[in-house]
Every structure is written in C-alpha cells, then in structure tokens.
C-alpha cells in the first residue's frame, strides 16, 4: 500500500474517532439543554470577500457546542428565508429547551424574522442581543463625537509610532510594564481599553522619551519624533481630554469585566448596567445627562430583556440587599418570564405563588445556611441547595440563571475553515462535502473544549489537530 494512501486512511480513522467523541459530547450536552435550558447563539460574520455567514452554537452551564455554519449571503435581506433558517435551528435544538437566542445582528430583517419565529412557537423563549456587542455599539456612539474622535486620533498616532518601529518597541518594554494595545476582538472596546492604558502609562512614556537611549538614537532628531514627543510631554489639553473620555468609557468596559468574572452573569447584568451609569455620573460630577440618555437608548432598544430583570430579582445577593428596588420594570420582567418559560418545565401559577415565599424570605430561604451562602456559592447552586421547597420557582430560577449574556466574540474564533467549506462546495462531491462538514464540526468543538472566553480574546490550551 502506498504511503499517501496510508496517511489518508490514518487521517480518516482519526477524524472518525474524534467525530464519535464529539457526538457523545453533544448527546450529553443535549440532556443538560433539556434539564436547565440553553442559549442558542447566532454569530453573524462576514468573510474578507464580503459574503455573509451565521455560525450556530449552543451554550449551557456544561459548555459551548458548535452545531453548524450557514452561508446566508443570498437570504440576509429576505425575511421569509431568514425565518425559515431560524425555524430549522429552533427545531434542531428544541423550542422548549431554549431560554434565549442571542444574536449580534441588529438589522431590521433579522428583527422582523425574530418576531415571526416567536409568534410561530407562541413565545416559549426570548431573543436577546449579545451584551458585548451592545456595549461595543454604545462605545461606537461615544467614539463618533467630535471631541472624542480627536482624542482617539492623537492616541492612535502615539501607539502607531511606538508599535511600528523597533527602538520605541524595545524601550516600551523597559519603561511600560503593561501592554498598551488591547487585543479584544470588539473594535471599540479595544479602542477604549487602549486609551485607558495609554493615559495610565503617560509618566512612563515621558521617561522613555527623556531617556539617554532615546536621546542618542537617530529617531531623536526626526520630525515625526518631535511631533509624537510633543504630544506625550507637553500636550496637556490632549491628556486632560483623554482622561475625561476614560471617565465615561471605563465604567462600561469594567461592566463587561464584571460579567466575565461571575459564573452567573444573567443574575448581575441589570445591576452591572445600573452601577456603570452611577459610576459615570460620579466621574463627571453630575454632567452625565447626554451619556445616560444614549445608554438608555441602547439598553431599551437593543439589550434589555425580561430575562435580565428576572435574573436581577432571582439573584439572592441582590434581592436580599438594601439596594434592591422592586420597580415596574422588574415586576413586568419576572411576570413575563414566569408565564413564557413555564409552558413545559414548571407551572407558572405555582411559580408565581412560590415567588411570595422567596420575596418574604420564608421557609428554607430564611435558614442560616441560606443566608451564609448568599455570597459564598454561585446563584444556581444556591437555588439547588435552598429552593427545593419551592420546586417550580427553583426550576425557573435555575433555567434563567444558568444562561449567558454573551455571544461567541469572547472565544475569538477563526471561522476561516467554515468559509472554505462554503466557498468550495460546488467543486466537491457529496461525500467530500460531508467529510468537510465533519471536519468543521470536530474542529470547532475541539477548539471550544479547550478555549476560555475572555474580553481580550480567548485563551487557548492544547494543540488543535482536527482539520
């Protein structure tokens, strides 16, 4: 047997073994989808040649699963075809397993298709926008203002000069300990993280440009250096303006970090947004009106969901604290969730009645262990430990608090394999295309089992040998 054929058979054997392992993992995760619900993630992205794709992933408390990618270039502006695509996804996952469908597409076509899909299934789940994408939209609005755009332009001049030349990069390593450029795949999150780091590094940058190593270099006499040095050393107007911008953007970026560090982000999103607004108000000395208005516009128009209000109430750390406010938005959110999510998994009327027990802190909710563990264990675990006497409410709470607020952005996934799958489809036989689909399925799921999502881009451990 020739060596080439042996290699081909060996690769096929490895692929089939990894395919079996991935299928087994999917079966296990599907059981969790039925028990505690899941979030379907529709990650919309474009190829370098401008074609539109959607990758379908499913999140649950046991992990993230990649199902498939779809070329939607010909249907992205067709509501009927978008709706058919969404219906196929929902039927595959199971409508009553889904708590929410998270998208990063705010187009009117997708919004209309969402409406028809919810109507088709009688609203057993919610559509929400990825929290990362929403904050990125908000930061984009901030960046578009004239004063801020001028600050960002000068900041970019500094970072471009440093990162484009060997000597500044070498000296930066000596004088500035932290990396200045952010690697976040969220464009405007990265822009404002970079600006904050630049503001923090100013003193060290001044020292760098005043160093003997710099003064003796060929760069010291260049016109470009004099320009950059002038900004760093003496342009106090720029640095004050940059510091003022950071007072607005830091609370919003910090909110995303806060969500990242909590095992149950659904339970803290509502509170985290309120805290970010209060931080902006405090930072600006009360001159926050325009920023609050923009935040509220994005929140109300894109991000806010009854799920976030319900998660806020069902988080005992917040609900039993002095800062909890039972307003109309919270009341409406918990009522809508109680009814819509309870079609199969619990009885809405019983859950509503049991909510009074939770509200009044009666029964097991008033026990010493329940009080002690409010801050000691994750919210879902708290409900498992102390909600057994209110089983319908417990089921609802666990289904809501088990969900994420994010899409796939934090995994920083390279979708190039999916692009190759679709671009070359017409040149393959049906068997070859099936094999390529298996490679895609194994490749991305192997990646997801080893990747840790984070705001700066996924940290990845291990070699990805599939595909």
Name the predicted role of every residue range:
Residues 1-467:
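Short alpha-helical patches at protein termini and domain edges
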């Amino acid at each position: 047997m020739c060596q080439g054929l042996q290699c081909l058979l060996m690769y096929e054997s490895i692929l089939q073994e990894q395919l079996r392992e991935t299928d087994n993992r999917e079966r296990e995760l599907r059981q969790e989808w039925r028990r505690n619900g899941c979030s379907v993630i529709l990650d919309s992205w474009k190829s370098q040649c401008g074609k539109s794709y959607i990758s379908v992933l499913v999140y649950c408390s046991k992990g993230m699963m990649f199902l498939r990618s779809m070329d939607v270039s010909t249907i992205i502006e067709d509501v009927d075809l978008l709706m058919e695509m969404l219906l196929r996804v929902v039927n595959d996952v199971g409508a009553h397993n889904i708590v929410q469908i998270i998208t990063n597409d705010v187009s009117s076509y997708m919004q209309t298709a969402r409406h028809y899909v919810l109507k088709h299934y009688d609203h057993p789940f919610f559509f929400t926008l990825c929290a990362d994408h929403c904050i990125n939209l908000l930061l984009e609005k901030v960046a578009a203002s004239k004063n801020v755009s001028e600050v960002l332009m000068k900041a970019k001049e500094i970072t471009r000069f440093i990162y484009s030349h060997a000597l500044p990069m070498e000296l930066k390593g000596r004088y500035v300990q932290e990396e200045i450029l952010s690697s976040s795949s969220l464009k405007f999150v990265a822009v404002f993280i970079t600006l904050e780091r630049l503001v923090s590094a100013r003193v060290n940058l001044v020292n760098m440009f005043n160093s003997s190593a710099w003064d003796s270099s060929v760069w010291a006499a260049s016109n470009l250096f004099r320009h950059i040095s002038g900004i760093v050393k003496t342009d106090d107007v720029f640095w004050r303006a940059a510091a003022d911008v950071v007072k607005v953007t830091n609370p919003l970026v910090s909110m995303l970090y806060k969500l990242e560090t909590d095992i149950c982000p659904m339970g803290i999103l509502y509170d985290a947004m309120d805290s970010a607004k209060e931080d902006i108000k405090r930072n600006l000395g009360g001159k926050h009106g325009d920023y609050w208005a923009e935040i509220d516009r994005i929140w109300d128009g894109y991000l806010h969901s009854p799920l976030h209000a319900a998660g806020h109430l069902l988080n005992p750390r917040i609900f039993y604290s002095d800062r909890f406010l039972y307003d109309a938005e919270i009341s409406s959110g918990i009522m809508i969730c109680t009814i819509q999510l309870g079609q199969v998994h619990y009885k809405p009327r019983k859950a509503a009645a049991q909510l009074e027990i939770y509200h009044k802190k009666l029964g097991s909710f008033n026990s010493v262990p329940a009080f002690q563990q409010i801050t000691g264990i994750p919210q879902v675990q708290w409900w498992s430990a102390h909600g057994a006497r209110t089983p319908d409410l417990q089921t609802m709470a666990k289904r809501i608090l088990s969900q994420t607020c994010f899409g796939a952005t934090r995994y920083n996934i390279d979708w190039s394999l999916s692009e190759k799958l679709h671009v070359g489809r017409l040149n393959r036989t049906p068997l070859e295309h099936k094999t390529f689909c298996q490679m895609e399925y194994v490749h991305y799921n192997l990646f997801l089992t080893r990747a840790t999502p984070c705001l700066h881009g996924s940290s990845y451990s291990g070699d990805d040998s599939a595909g």
